[in-house]
């Protein structure tokens, strides 16, 4: 019996390792932890309940982007970290979002006051992984910031940081500007004329 418990724990830890120490109740159930066992582990301090149906291993080292994984699990892996939250995770720009920005499928209906949802179908090429969480690519992130902000200083800070970090070239961004509306495209061109003439 102790070997079974150890095998269960190892399976759960392997799963949590790819998710910044987080896991969902449904994932624990799939590994072999009944709901009663889940309650036991929370009550005895073996797991921390982060939200309804979302847990974390308490001794797991914290990382810079840990909280993003929580929201990906909350969405049942349907959300992609995006917009200001993605820019902040990449360290690009003067963004400091008060809420977590997530891009979700058009039929996504969950909601939480701590998140801002953006409904859009994202092509695979626009999605990356960062510490186990799905996040928009740098190019998609920059386009999202251009679309959602009229403050050119903020937009410029994100574009300039992405270019300076080598995460994006001006040519790559210019090729994708056709995806934006006319006002957003003009804003991006003005910024690019200043930072990448």
Where is each model-derived feature located?
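Short gly/ser-rich loop at a beta-strand->alpha-helix junction or flexible surface loop bordering the NTP-binding
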Residues: 1-197
């Amino acid at each position: 019996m102790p070997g079974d418990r150890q095998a269960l724990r190892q399976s759960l830890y392997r799963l949590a390792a790819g998710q910044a120490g987080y896991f969902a109740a449904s994932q624990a159930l799939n590994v072999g932890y009944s709901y009663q066992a889940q309650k036991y582990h929370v009550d005895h301090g073996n797991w921390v309940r982060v939200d309804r149906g979302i847990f974390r291993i308490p001794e797991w080292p914290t990382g810079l982007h840990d909280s993003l994984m929580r929201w990906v699990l909350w969405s049942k892996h349907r959300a992609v970290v995006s917009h200001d939250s993605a820019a902040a995770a990449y360290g690009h720009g003067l963004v400091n979002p008060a809420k977590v920005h997530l891009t979700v499928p058009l039929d996504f209906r969950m909601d939480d006051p701590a998140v801002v949802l953006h409904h859009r179908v994202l092509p695979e090429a626009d999605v990356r992984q960062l510490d186990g969480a799905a996040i928009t690519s740098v190019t998609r992130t920059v386009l999202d910031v251009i679309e959602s902000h009229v403050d050119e200083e903020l937009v410029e800070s994100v574009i300039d940081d992405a270019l300076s970090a080598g995460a994006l070239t001006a040519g790559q961004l210019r090729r994708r500007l056709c995806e934006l509306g006319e006002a957003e495209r003009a804003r991006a061109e003005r910024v690019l004329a200043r930072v990448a003439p």
